[in-house]
């Protein structure tokens, strides 16, 4: 962002997610794996609501990049503390039933993202879910898209659990492009994608 090469440049106070999305970074969660009173520069940390009803409210800023961006440090030298997506209002089971065919991703492989444009492409494995029922495993597939589009097509389940320093409930992402071997044929189609983090 400070170099002007991020797809999130100049996006503060703009809607980048769907309006149901709220994202927090809370350094004071009791027994949180990322909890801390001060960041790596000794700046006191505080709770940040990074995304408020889909609107980007803050960047993660330390003193060095704060000067470059003309922003005050928000105690994020070294990155996030306890970052999480607020849970949604739909149950996990009902989320799987929202669409007739859903690809449930359990693992991503590799890293192929362009943070300038927001384009990305990663290998993945998971399961095909039909009408809420897990049918068969899938592997050697590639999921691709653009973060700008993906962020606005997320629906969150209500199954948020705090297991790591970054946490999210199961999320349904609509309109992803999937390519790979599908049983004996090749699939190249838009499907609904569920990520379990």
Language-model regions: role of each:
Residues 1, 195-197:
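Accessible peptide chain termini
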Residues 1-8:
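Active-site pocket-lining segments that scaffold enzyme catalytic pockets across diverse folds
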Residues 8-195:
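Dual-mode signal for accessory low-complexity, basic/Gly-rich regions
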């Amino acid at each position: 962002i400070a170099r002007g090469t991020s797809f999130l440049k100049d996006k503060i106070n703009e809607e980048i997610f769907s309006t149901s999305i709220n994202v927090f970074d809370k350094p004071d969660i009791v027994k949180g794996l990322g909890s801390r009173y001060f960041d790596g520069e000794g700046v006191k940390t505080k709770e940040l609501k990074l995304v408020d009803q889909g609107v980007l409210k803050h960047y993660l800023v330390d003193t060095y990049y704060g000067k470059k961006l003309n922003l005050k440090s928000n105690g994020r030298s070294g990155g996030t503390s306890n970052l999480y997506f607020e849970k949604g209002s739909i149950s996990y089971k009902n989320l799987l039933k929202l669409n007739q065919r859903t690809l449930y991703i359990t693992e991503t492989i590799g890293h192929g993202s362009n943070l300038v444009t927001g384009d990305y492409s990663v290998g993945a494995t998971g399961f095909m879910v039909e009408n809420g029922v897990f049918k068969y495993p899938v592997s050697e597939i590639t999921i691709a898209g653009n973060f700008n589009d993906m962020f606005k097509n997320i629906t969150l389940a209500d199954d948020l659990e705090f297991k790591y320093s970054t946490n999210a409930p199961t999320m349904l992402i609509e309109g992803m492009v999937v390519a790979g071997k599908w049983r004996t044929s090749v699939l190249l189609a838009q499907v609904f994608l569920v990520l379990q983090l």
